[in-house]
């Protein structure tokens, strides 16, 4: 059902307008023209006010209020920030990220860091950030001090990656830790755009997701459910400290793992990389050794190997 014929518009716009006009014909027929004009104006205002509004500003920081905080583990939280109106959306293109800024005690300048929301523009009225707090992480530590009702400065969109359906035949992904967040954004967009969901996206997806311990695997339930529902999405987990009877990878992500699990170098594939800087550096070298085009210092959309 389109937004024009949604239940909300039928009950909140069309029926009240019809009742206004009908009631006027009973009371005084001469007022029908005025009642009709009033109904049109009110209906237009109602329809317009319900239309999703993109709130991000790429040039100026805006304050967003912390609405909720969900503890995932001892050092990972999901922070939910409210948008100004319940119908507002962030307006973030798939593959891009936002900048968070804060004044940190002991720092001479305002600190700015980039994060990718795990929510999307399908989620009106709020956006969610999955953040791991690091001992030396200025913004991640600042987020842990926020209380419900506190504000955070946000600017965006930002980034060179903008995913479009079928931009390549096959996407390989290598993620480490919280580097899974931009990958999840792309994965969900592809699956949402499948033919069975009314789209035309047939992109194959293979993900290598590396972590230290089993408890460090973020969003595992959601990822596993997505893979269960979509045959064209496959995950290979890698752990430094695997449990007994582990059937995934062990140690660091190796060229052999990449060769076995990700698409071979070709003109219609892309490899996405996101994780801690040492891992990203190692994966750049590994992909180049396997015949993929050398990753640039600053990634561009057209690059075969793209690093977030």
From Swiss-Prot:
Q: Which Pfam families match?
A: FAD_binding_6, NAD_binding_1
Recorded GO molecular functions are:
cytochrome-b5 reductase activity, acting on NAD(P)H; NADH dehydrogenase activity; transferase activity
This protein's source sits in the domain of life called Eukaryota
* Principal location: mitochondrion
Segments spanning the bilayer are 10-27
- Membrane topology, from the record: Single-pass membrane protein
One Gene Ontology CC term in the entry: mitochondrial outer membrane
Which InterPro entries does the record cross-reference, listed alphabetically?
CBR-like (IPR001834), Cbr1-like_FAD-bd_dom (IPR008333), FAD-bd_FR_type (IPR017927), Flavoprot_Pyr_Nucl_cyt_Rdtase (IPR001709), FNR_nucleotide-bd (IPR039261), OxRdtase_FAD/NAD-bd (IPR001433), Riboflavin_synthase-like_b-brl (IPR017938)
Compartments where located? Mitochondrion outer membrane
Q: Please state the Enzyme Commission number of this protein.
A: 1.6.2.2
Recorded catalytic reaction(s): these are: 2 Fe(III)-[cytochrome b5] + NADH = 2 Fe(II)-[cytochrome b5] + NAD(+) + H(+); 2 Fe(3+)-[Dph3] + NADH = 2 Fe(2+)-[Dph3] + NAD(+) + H(+)
Q: Which residues form the FAD-binding FR-type domain?
A: 59-164
UniProt KW keywords = FAD, Flavoprotein, Membrane, Mitochondrion, Mitochondrion outer membrane, NAD, Oxidoreductase, Transferase, Transmembrane, Transmembrane helix
State its cofactor: FAD
Please give a single GO biological process term from the UniProt record.
Answer: protein histidyl modification to diphthamide
| Binding positions (FAD) | 144-159, 170-207
Q: Which SUPFAM superfamilies match?
A: Ferredoxin reductase-like, C-terminal NADP-linked domain, Riboflavin synthase domain-like
Question: PANTHER family attached here?
Answer: NADH-CYTOCHROME B5 REDUCTASE (PTHR19370), NADH-CYTOCHROME B5 REDUCTASE-LIKE (PTHR19370:SF184)
Tell me, how does this one assemble?
Monomer. Component of the 2-(3-amino-3-carboxypropyl)histidine synthase complex composed of DPH1, DPH2, DPH3 and a NADH-dependent reductase, predominantly CBR1.
Q: Which family does it belong to?
A: Belongs to the flavoprotein pyridine nucleotide cytochrome reductase family.
Q: What does this protein do?
A: NADH-dependent reductase for DPH3 and cytochrome b5. Required for the first step of diphthamide biosynthesis, a post-translational modification of histidine which occurs in elongation factor 2. DPH1 and DPH2 transfer a 3-amino-3-carboxypropyl (ACP) group from S-adenosyl-L-methionine (SAM) to a histidine residue, the reaction is assisted by a reduction system comprising DPH3 and a NADH-dependent reductase, predominantly CBR1. By reducing DPH3, also involved in the formation of the tRNA wobble base modification mcm5s 2U (5-methoxycarbonylmethyl-2-thiouridine), mediated by the elongator complex.
Protein name as annotated: NADH-cytochrome b5 reductase 1
What gene name is given for the protein in this entry?
CBR1
């Amino acid at each position: 059902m389109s937004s024009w014929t949604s239940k909300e518009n039928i009950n909140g716009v069309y029926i009240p307008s019809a009742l206004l006009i009908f009631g006027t014909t009973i009371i005084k027929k001469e007022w029908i023209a005025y009642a009709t004009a009033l109904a049109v104006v009110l209906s237009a205002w109602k329809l317009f006010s319900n239309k999703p509004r993109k709130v991000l500003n790429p040039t100026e920081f805006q304050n967003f209020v912390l609405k909720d905080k969900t503890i995932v583990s001892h050092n990972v939280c999901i922070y939910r920030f409210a948008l100004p109106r319940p119908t507002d959306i962030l307006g973030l293109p798939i593959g891009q990220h936002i900048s968070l800024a804060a004044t940190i005690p002991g720092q001479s300048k305002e600190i700015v860091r980039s994060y990718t929301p795990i929510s999307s523009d399908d989620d009106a009225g709020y956006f969610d950030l999955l953040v791991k707090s690091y001992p030396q992480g200025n913004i991640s530590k600042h987020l842990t001090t926020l209380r419900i009702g506190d504000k955070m400065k946000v600017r965006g969109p930002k980034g060179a990656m903008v995913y479009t359906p079928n931009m390549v035949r096959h996407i390989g992904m290598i993620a480490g830790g919280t580097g899974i967040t931009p990958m999840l954004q792309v994965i969900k967009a592809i699956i949402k755009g499948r033919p069975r969901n009314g789209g035309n996206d047939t992109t194959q997806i293979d993900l290598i997701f590396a972590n230290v311990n089993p408890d460090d695997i973020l969003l595992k339930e959601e990822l596993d459910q997505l893979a269960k529902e979509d045959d064209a999405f496959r995950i290979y987990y890698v752990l430094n400290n695997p449990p007994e009877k582990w059937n995934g990878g062990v140690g660091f992500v190796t060229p052999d793992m990449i060769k076995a699990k990700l698409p071979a170098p070709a003109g219609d594939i892309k490899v996405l990389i996101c994780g801690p800087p040492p891992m990203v550096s190692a994966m750049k070298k590994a992909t180049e050794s396997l015949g993929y085009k050398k990753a640039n210092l600053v990634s561009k959309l057209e690059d075969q190997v793209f690093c977030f």
